[in-house]
Amino acid sequence: MTDAVEYPDLVVVGAGLFGLTVAQQAVERLGVRVEIIDVRDHIGGNAYSYMDEETGAEIHKYGAHLFHTSNRRVWDYVNRFTSFTSYVHRVYATHDGEVYPLPINLGTINQFFHARYTPAEAKALIDGQAGELAGTDPQNLNDKGISLIGRPLYEAFIKNYTAKQWQTDPAELPASIIKRLPVRFNYDNRYFKDTWEGLPRDGYTAWMERMIDDPRIHVTLKTDFFDGSQPFNKAALAAAGVPVVYTGPVDRYFDYSLGELKWRTVDFREVRYDEGDHFGCPVMNFSDADVPYTRAIEFKNFNPERHDSQNPNKTVVWEEYSRFAERGDEPYYPINTEADKALYARYEELAKAEPLTVFGGRLGTYKYYDMHQVIDTALTAYEEQVEPLLKK
């Protein structure tokens, strides 16, 4: 390291939605210079997408990303950088040779039981089936699921899907993993209930490029914060007194000194079909144990408004497999056992002793966030933590 390095006013580690939002706000509000570094070769974090030339599909590289929010502040903010399609997310599940709508609703119930229950009749049925374990304290996820929606629906749609997600028999999983299982006693199969919903009209990556389209923001990709050979490394920035917004894994920041936080990860297997549409929907869950993957994503079906620019004779599907993450895997979902929560609380105490570093995002705070929640927490963190640091 030489004295010749001219440091920016702020370094953001991670070019995901949290980091991009903070960088955009810092430049807009204070006119500072910001350097964003990311170990990956693209911006956008897990929301990054790219176009598949053969099919005309927009591939969500890290799995399906659907934007939805009821937060007016977030909706107004994101609409500064993109407009959204009218896409409404609906999910279907294949079970025992039939396709059902999800979340479980009156249509699912009547199809499953070959009936035509009214809302009140369906509710009475499910309450009765859920009463199988009445008076007991569920000791595992299996019992909790049955106590919430009854054995027939739980075993059809939840049990094996959950076993595949966790690679563990639900009877061996803690009941605390599920707080509730939504059942709708009407025919509404909209997946999300938020006020606003859609997909960015010209893609996720174009949206995020516009967020940082400012000469005062510089992005350096394929750059590791912990690599001492590059100028924006942890030790050099600390020595120079440069404020840092860190969105990488919080345990990695502290060199795993207290132990590793546990995550689940996802693997994808790509399948191409010589037909224009394979599933007829964007996401198909597979609820049965004999299909090894949890769900399949058919990306073309997220964007029906692009039909004319898509290949009518080809489609691409990603099958999604879930497993426990090991070091080096992409962490997706925090496992959040009681031991993990206690470990994160100890890392949080260490973080408080880092006055020039603001921790954020899923990895930096060991939380699962939807996109709108990441943006909301980033706007708040900028106002409450980052701007005061920059004004010192």
Residue spans for each PLM region:
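Mid-domain catalytic core of redox enzymes
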Residues: 29, 226-350
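Beta1/beta-strand and adjacent pyrophosphate-binding region of the FAD-binding site
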Residues: 3-18, 35
